Amino acid sequence: MKLHFSFFIWVALIVCSTVMASDKIDEAIDLTQQSFVPVFIRMSDQVIARAGEYEKLCREHSGNPRAQNRKDVIAQLRCKADEAWQKIEKTANALVQNGGIRSIRQFWIVNGFSCLAKPTAIRKFAKRADISFIYLDRFARPSKKPLPMSGNAMTAMKEVLSTWMKKSTRFSGSLRIPWNVREIGAQSVWNEENATGKGIKVAVIDTGIISTPALIHALAKNSEEELNGLDDDGNGLIDDLFGYDFIANNGYILDSAKTTSHGSSCVGIIAGRSSKSGLQTAIAPDSKIMLLKGGFNLHSLEYLMSNGADIVSMSFMIVNRDLGQIRGLFRNAFEHLSLGGVLAVGGAGNYGPKSRRAMPVGKQIGLPKDIPCVLAIAGVDRSRVQLPFSSEGPCYWEGVRFFSDYSKSNSLSKPDLTAFPSGYPVWNISGSHKIRPDWREVEKDKGASLVVGPAGNSFSGPHAAGVAALMLSANPELNPWETSEILRETASDMGSVGTDYKFGAGLIDALAAVRAAKKRN
């Protein structure tokens, strides 16, 4: 009898262990095939492990200056990743040797690693207590080694460096300022509060920029790197002088597009210097820009966090695609990013109920703007009327592993704030005004033009980034969650009283936000 009972317990434990292991594997992974699958293996030891912990840690860290939080959080993240890798490295290397996995890439913004893995290896990893989940990596790209730029690209970048080294037009409040900059309150901030974004670095993940002085003079330069085809600062990247392209894996940060330059328009709204005629598009005209290419690349988040970015402005977003559990991985990363001192912002999207690309309620604002700590910015015209394309909330997180906290009965209120997405000059490729009959060129400058006409909430997001830069130049130690709170508290209410699904907390008020920022300890 004892023998039969022991056997029953043994079988039950095996079954239980198998069930628990399979529960760690993303349901989107097909384990019936024997081919390699792109996966991200999330370790159990995280600074933020599940929903609710970010808010708790924000409260605990609120008494610390942002610089201290950045230092401490990066150290924690790196330490956890290093310790976890030491424990699993032997197993991972053995699986590489026997053909079970390949193309390993380690990360610390979320403690884990990506690889191509066969089902047998996936099942083996799932049995380990130090692994919490195995995601289908829906954003996996072939791994490329850092390589020097092509000859033409190097020549173009040397021209950028040459222009950057020349003295730029000094910022002056007497320059011609577009209506959107004035009406968001930025010009009043410069004149009345003497806050211009000085000392603040904004990372922009986009398409890169046109080679034109007004944008080049806004760039932040990596003082430890030379433009020589080498990795001078020892960070594993070649020629990351003004940022990095994490898709091509090189330092070429110019826009390769031939018709329109999305990145140039966004950078110009945040930090564009004066044109040759004195037209200045920037909200934070003394802030500096770090250029990055490669949305949904965790290494780009690690790079900007460890290289001193205070804010990250993003235009990329995914809607109308089932991302499954991978949403939780990116929420994890952005919560770590925020805890470590970087405010993430971006446009809420152009999928509103009256848009030609309209999406259903609850699906108009996608990853990463649907993440609670990422500010999603909606759009109104100069008359404060909602633009037809502007995406509306709410957002849901029900069923997302570790982060299933916002259901349809308890939804996440989005967008967060509102700004202006069109009707003012933006930097673009010369000749781009010919794309649409209602676009017009207002000025030509070296290598580029200022064009009125391009529209989209991708241009609302940079307004929030620029205003946040003004706030941080007035009070550099504000933490991201404190900056977000002030922006919401000082916004001009629109639509229904209080926060709503069309305008969030309302239209951003730069002057009120900067004054409130100065009063925070």
List the predicted regions and their residue ranges.
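Protease zymogen maturation seam
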Residues: 127-201, 211-215, 386-393
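Inhibitory N-terminal propeptides of secreted protease zymogens
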Residues: 22-155
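Extracellular S/T/G-rich loop segment that most often corresponds to the catalytic His/Ser-adjacent loop
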Residues: 206, 235, 366-469
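Bacterial N-terminal signal peptides
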Residues: 6-17
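Substrate-binding/access-modulating region of protease and related hydrolase catalytic domains
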Residues: 197-198, 273-277, 290-374, 383-384, ...
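C-terminal subdomain of the subtilisin-like protease fold in secreted/lumenal serine endopeptidases
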Residues: 178, 280, 311-313, 450-451, ...
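Active-site-proximal beta-strand/loop segments in catalytic clefts of secreted hydrolases
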Residues: 43-45, 117, 137, 204-208, ...
